[in-house]
């Protein structure tokens, strides 16, 4: 019959954080090796796609790595993907353009009203 292994930590339950892998040591003994949970890639806050250029780590491990592993040198780097940043910049530009156009149209209508009043007198 195969050799049995037991958990090496205090938690006796088969939970997601207490997974083990049975490993044979050089001495021929089977031991339980605790397996860490897999890390997920950081996602874009707008579209949900995986962010490129950012390390895939467990949340606590981000505290131990340098800033270059956590960001990219761009606006919203490490938070939004390049396509979403491009979209935001274009949208902001178009909104500003629309404000300027609205202001110019308003000034033109006011000037037209003033000229009508002068021509009536």
Curated annotation (Swiss-Prot):
It is found in: Cytoplasm. GO terms for biological process: cytoplasmic translation; ribosome biogenesis. Disulfide bonds: none annotated. The keyword Transmembrane helix does not apply. One of its GO terms (cellular component) is cytosol. One of its GO terms (molecular function) is structural constituent of ribosome. InterPro entries: Ribosomal_eL34, Ribosomal_eL34_C_sf, Ribosomal_eL34_CS. Keywords: Cytoplasm, Ribonucleoprotein, Ribosomal protein. Its main location: cytoplasm. Present with 21000 molecules/cell in log phase SD medium. Component of the ribosome, a large ribonucleoprotein complex responsible for the synthesis of proteins in the cell. The small ribosomal subunit (SSU) binds messenger RNAs (mRNAs) and translates the encoded message by selecting cognate aminoacyl-transfer RNA (tRNA) molecules. The large subunit (LSU) contains the ribosomal catalytic site termed the peptidyl transferase center (PTC), which catalyzes the formation of peptide bonds, thereby polymerizing the amino acids delivered by tRNAs into a polypeptide chain. PANTHER family: 60S RIBOSOMAL PROTEIN L34. Component of the large ribosomal subunit (LSU). Mature yeast ribosomes consist of a small (40S) and a large (60S) subunit. The 40S small subunit contains 1 molecule of ribosomal RNA (18S rRNA) and 33 different proteins (encoded by 57 genes). The large 60S subunit contains 3 rRNA molecules (25S, 5.8S and 5S rRNA) and 46 different proteins (encoded by 81 genes). Belongs to the eukaryotic ribosomal protein eL34 family. This is Large ribosomal subunit protein eL34B. The lineage of its organism: Eukaryota, Fungi, Dikarya, Ascomycota, Saccharomycotina.
